[in-house]
């Protein structure tokens, strides 16, 4: 903005990730770069990222498994840059000091969440890859779709966690995979998403089982809208930027679908507006 508060220059962008800035480098330049954040300070001292690494590839896709298997992880980046492939098996975000994948297959013997990531070890101008997620559930079968939600433990618990601070509107990063209710629960989609608590203080927030809102196209933490028919009784709706994972409020432990069922029955055959729903196991 100039001295009269008129826009002097603007740029519409989509952030590549939450911990990366986009700005002019050097200051007042016409060149726009990915930068290390320098809030309130000059961009002249920021590290400039010229490229990003490709994410690792897992040999077995997320889903339901019935027996133990060996998991292999592939680094798809060419040999022009020195990299390190790391992983975790507890759902936490990999760091450069996490376990290094050396090429030896990882034995998966029970339900496991793996996150893998690739870092440049020498060239600081390369952004680390996005995380690759694999969630393997052993001998699971549901009559409902299954929604797999992975996030850092301290995003939920502790002084900065949204479970332990359920009255906050804090937004956290997560990854979601949707498995359909068809035989074998095939994957419908997976994506990065933002998550936050939702609902009223009298039920949806305060009870041990909480309600979430997922924002698939969140500008910093999400990825894109979901172009799928997620709720069967409104097949004309095939684009979702948000969904509400509702715990059933005061009926959360006895009849969590009560409100949704009553509303659906009262709206059947009428032109009344109502909230459609699809039961899901999370």
Regions inferred by a protein language model and the residue ranges of each:
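Secretome/extracellular-domain signature
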Residues: 1-5
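Short beta-alpha junctions and helix-cap segments that line functional grooves
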Residues: 8-11, 277-279
């Amino acid at each position: 903005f100039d001295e009269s508060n008129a826009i002097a220059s603007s740029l519409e962008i989509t952030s590549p990730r939450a911990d990366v800035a986009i700005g002019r480098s050097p200051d007042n330049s016409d060149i726009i770069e990915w930068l290390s954040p320098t809030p309130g300070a000059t961009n002249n001292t920021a590290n400039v990222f010229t490229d990003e690494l490709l994410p690792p590839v897992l040999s077995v896709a997320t889903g339901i498994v019935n027996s133990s298997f060996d998991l292999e992880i592939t680094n798809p980046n060419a040999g022009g840059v020195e990299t390190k492939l790391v992983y975790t098996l507890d759902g936490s975000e990999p760091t450069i000091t996490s376990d290094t994948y050396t090429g030896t297959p990882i034995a998966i013997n029970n339900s496991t969440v793996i996150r893998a990531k690739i870092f440049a070890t020498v060239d600081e101008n390369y952004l680390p890859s996005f995380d690759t997620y694999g969630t393997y559930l052993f001998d699971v079968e549901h009559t409902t779709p299954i929604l797999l939600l992975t996030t850092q433990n301290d995003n939920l618990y502790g002084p900065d966690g949204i479970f332990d601070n359920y009255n906050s509107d804090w937004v956290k990063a997560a990854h979601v995979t949707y498995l359909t209710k068809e035989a074998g629960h095939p994957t419908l989609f997976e994506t990065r998403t933002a998550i936050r608590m939702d609902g009223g203080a009298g039920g949806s927030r305060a009870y041990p089982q909480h309600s979430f809102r997922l924002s698939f196209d969140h500008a910093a933490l999400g990825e894109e809208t979901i172009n799928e028919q997620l709720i069967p009784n409104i097949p004309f709706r095939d684009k979702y930027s948000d969904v509400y994972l509702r715990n059933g409020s005061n009926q959360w432990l006895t009849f969590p679908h009560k409100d949704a069922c009553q509303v659906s029955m009262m709206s059947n055959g009428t032109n009344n507006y109502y909230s459609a729903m699809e039961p899901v196991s999370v």
